[in-house]
Amino acid sequence: MTSEPRKSRGPFTPALFIASIMTAVNIQLLLLAGMCYLYGTASHQASRYSNLEILAISLDDGDIGTALTLASSQFDGRYHLPTVKIGSSQDYPDLDSIRNSVCKADYWAAVVINSGSSDRIYGIWNGSMSTVEYDPAAAATYIYNQARHPNIADSILLPGINALVKATTESFYGSSNARSALMNLNTSNVLLPAIKTYLNPIGTTADLIQPTPQLNRSFYNTYEIGLLFHGITGCPCLSMSVYIYAYRESWNVDGAVFCKSWMLYWLLMDIHWQVMETLIACYIPMQFSPFFVFPWIITNVASTVFPYEIMPAWYKIGYALPSSGVYTLNIHIWSGCGSQLGVALPALFVWWALGHITSVFAVRKRCSDSAKEPWSSSDST
């Protein structure tokens, strides 16, 4: 008994050619739309730097504290710099209270004129204090959480802080006490130290919340968020946590942080899996799955790449996405600081709960649809 020869494929028909072209065009449009959405997060970003607020506090009752207040009025949203808000020493009596305010994300950063700064400068000028006793960096302290969007913190907040300190110095030069003190110098043993102090009266000391100096920090809210789609078990999450921990360099995180991040990444992978399980091959045909998966990845990455304060208002829908909640929780795990937990935790719980509930119905629907499909003649013989 001879088998029937297999039929060769038909010619490349015009219909097949048109279908191939349409698929290629649709894929290109999908990529274009996705990347436009991602690039839109940085559109005219500099015009929104003023939405980042820096708290300015003077614990000094002298001229430097007054100069800070005068200089802060220049930072009102102009010049593509963060906005400076003047705080009261009654509300923030010490560095701990100011640091706590930044930790809670009430402000992105803080600049503090330390107590006694003016007296120390005038002590140099009148000869009652030696230059050995004076450190310009002790005049002011700046605070920000470097674990919270570190690239933005270093590229936007730090230049804003430096600009504020420079403006404070210029304002201090113009004070009547500073001018008269310098003009009244009359002894050579005081003149040289006084000039040195006059040229550099106000320096800064950094008091960073969770210093994050490693350069691979740029991947934490970009590449890593997109990579969390590549697995659904604890092993990929573990490997991700391992290489982040292994390349932490001088980053001060311990084993507890490592384990918490591992569990958090696992939660996010589980949410992504439940979303795919519910929709793909159930409500979205398999051939159209790229038109859902790619936008889902892009919108999740876009929700973490920049702070919402400097993105167009439309992107605030990212608060509802799971990746945004995971990055918010990661900041809290890494630094112990950050607000918006009241948004991140409920959002993640809703995604997780709904995903597990709807995936059950999705499986039932697929089984029901499969039972309704007739067997082909080739399979039934």
Predicted region positions:
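Structural signal for the C-terminal ends of transmembrane alpha-helices
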Residues: 204, 237-242
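Hydrophobic alpha-helical membrane segments, chiefly transmembrane helices and signal peptide h-regions
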Residues: 31, 35, 230-239
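Extracytoplasmic/periplasmic domains immediately adjacent to an N-terminal transmembrane anchor
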Residues: 2-215, 378-381
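Membrane-spanning alpha-helical segments of multipass transporters and channels
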Residues: 214-231, 240-381
